[in-house]
Regions:
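Short, Lys/Arg-rich flexible segments
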Residues: 1-161
Length: 161
């Protein structure tokens, strides 16, 4: 049984002769940076607008609004907003809160972010239970921009070939 070739082999040889590996690597890296910056910008914008990815936050309790003097969630000190970042590693990117980032009280921002993203129930020894509802600020943005991120990678690949 022989092997049959199909497709435009002359075109394939021409494309591969130009060593697309280095150009493809660069294009993918540039798309990765573009996507990471897009997501960081939109996560921050979503927090400020109180609707990351178009999904409105659960409203604050009246007692919280009175104590804070504001009805806006996640922006009273600005530490969470300023801690949202990206880290590029070759053709990968991390977008969110880096471990080791702390606020002025020494609290890990990644822990605070997890509580905000997923919610929490805190039981005090006095018997009082505080329920913090989830106010997702990362996942809704990543879902909303999923197709744009994919398209950015497609364009990067097309630019090489």
């Amino acid at each position: 049984m022989g092997v049959k070739r199909f497709g435009d082999w002359d075109k394939a040889k021409a494309l591969l002769a130009n060593n697309p590996g280095a150009r493809l690597t660069l294009a993918i890296r540039q798309a990765t940076i573009k996507n990471a910056l897009l997501l960081v910008r939109e996560i921050k914008r979503g927090i400020v607008k109180q609707a990351p990815g178009g999904v409105p936050f659960v409203k604050l309790a009246e007692s919280t609004i009175e104590r804070k003097g504001s009805s806006k969630a996640l922006i009273d000190t600005g530490f969470l907003l300023s801690a949202i970042t990206q880290k590029i590693m070759a053709d990968q990117a991390f977008v969110g809160l880096l471990r080791g980032t702390v606020n002025k009280d020494g609290e890990q921002m990644v822990n605070i972010g997890a509580i905000m993203e997923y919610g929490a129930t805190i039981k005090h020894p006095s018997g009082v239970t505080i329920i913090l509802p989830a106010r997702p600020f990362l996942h809704p943005v990543m879902e909303a921009y999923r197709e744009q991120v994919i398209e950015n990678y497609r364009q990067a690949i097309r630019s090489v070939f």
